[in-house]
Amino acid sequence: MTKEVRVRYAPSPTGFLHIGGARTALFNYLYAKHHNGKFIVRIEDTDIERNVEGGEASQLDNLKWLGIEYDESIDIGGPYAPYRQMERLDIYKEHAEKLLAQGAAYKCFCSSEKLEASREEQKARGVAAPTYDGTCRHLSAEEVAAKEAAGEPYTIRMRVPENVTYDFEDLVRGQVTFESKDIGDWVIVKANGIPTYNYAVVLDDHFMEISHVFRGEEHLSNTPKQMMIFDAFGWEYPRFGHMTLIINENRKKLSKRDESIIQFVTQYKDLGYLPEAMFNFFALLGWSPEGEEEIFSKEEFIKIFDEKRLSKSPSMFDKQKLTWMNNQYIKKLSLEEVVALSLPHLQKAGLLPDELSAVQHAWATDLIGLYHDQMSFGAEIVELSSLFFKDHIEYDEEAKAVLAGEQVPEVMAAFKAQLEELEEFTPDAVKAAIKAVQKATGHKGKNLFMPIRVVTTGETHGPELPNAICLIGKEKAIDRVEKFAQ
């Protein structure tokens, strides 16, 4: 590849970093780094009314958190600055005037009411996709001047060439073709002087020397409009690649209103998902490596990334796979790292104080250690460890079935007696106490362990029993046995 690879992720600050945007950014990043190229983040902020406070920061901060490092953007600058569209208005204005001068564009004075009436009339005739009817396309220079002199507001429209076929080799889906007759003259500059997306993006891509454009499938129909602008100026197209949709488990297109899936990167961060796991998961959301392996480091992904393996079929957002993958990464963490990940969630839930004594921190560390290999994300520790913070235990049907055994009263009475005699309350001491109960009662296996587990923890499954009872504490464990006996 002779020309330097330069790709871009160009979000609008109309919302926070979405999983779809994160995937787009990631594939662009991997492609650039695989080819020793540059990854640019450009902010497309011309939709002023819809821009939200914190939108820009969410995009940049969460990309950094994911480990998607960009080479040029609004915060670090670069040779093609500015990287914010509202700071590039002079460029768009200058080139719109060039398009007007060469007749490739024209001023349109049609009111929104007239345009709406035209759309409705076309729909009534059965036109599936109404287009502009061309009212102002043939205005003379004198007519245009008169309307301007009268102060009539206008937009600038692209004069769509007649009988032109726009075809290109899409890097994901192969040959794609559009016909100019299906497009209609479209607005490149709105009445307020702000450029539209399909116009501004071409100028930005050209002047920033973007070589490849990887983006979502929803942008496919924008491509012929953008090709018109490139053609009008005699500029070379970048290579285009349109990634398939992300779908939910019902195989429906992922919508931001779909509450069955957490959709924003910052939400995963807040729940205690790991950035390395999210990076790994997003990389496999519409791309597949050779072989069966699914866990890769960032460096490995950069080395093996091949755009030819981008999927042509919709990509399902598999929540269970993400949970499994995050657990694989949590297992690799040290105990200290797992504590740093999950302890704040216990504190936020009000289960532990914000300021911990050395004894409290040691207890919390042991508690979290019990669930190290089981934990799927940091916040899950609150649910996993709930048995340690309950004042009152309620037994479910499975637990009640265990406690219905004839041997249970004898086992629990013996266990209570053993607990009361313990001077040191350690896992080894509790283990010895359980063995003593076995010896005294003759009960063993599930008939011994299950009643003790259910009465002391309220659960039929859980972490290593002596360790759990030790963390519950002698006084609380005895209290739970006594309440059961009542």
UniProtKB/Swiss-Prot annotation:
Which parts of the sequence bind ATP?
K256
Q: Name one Pfam family in it.
A: tRNA-synt_1c
* Catalytically driven reaction(s): tRNA(Glu) + L-glutamate + ATP = L-glutamyl-tRNA(Glu) + AMP + diphosphate
Q: If you read the UniProt record, what top EC class would you report for this enzyme, in one word?
A: ligase
Q: What is its EC number?
A: 6.1.1.17
**Molecular-function GO terms, alphabetical:** ATP binding; glutamate-tRNA ligase activity; tRNA binding; zinc ion binding
Cystine residue pairs = none
Q: Does the keyword Repeat apply?
A: no
Query: Which coenzyme or cofactor does it need?
Result: Zn(2+)
- Where is Zn(2+) bound in this sequence? C108, C110, C136, H138
List the GO terms this entry assigns under cellular component, sorted alphabetically.
Answer: cytosol
Motif annotated as 'HIGH' region, chain positions: 11-21
Q: What does this protein do?
A: Catalyzes the attachment of glutamate to tRNA(Glu) in a two-step reaction: glutamate is first activated by ATP to form Glu-AMP and then transferred to the acceptor end of tRNA(Glu).
- What quaternary structure, including any partners, is listed in this protein's UniProt entry? Monomer.
Q: Which protein, by its recorded name, is this?
A: Glutamate--tRNA ligase
Origin organism is Lysinibacillus sphaericus (strain C3-41)
Provide the taxonomic classification: Bacteria, Bacillati, Bacillota, Bacilli, Bacillales
Q: Which gene encodes it?
A: gltX
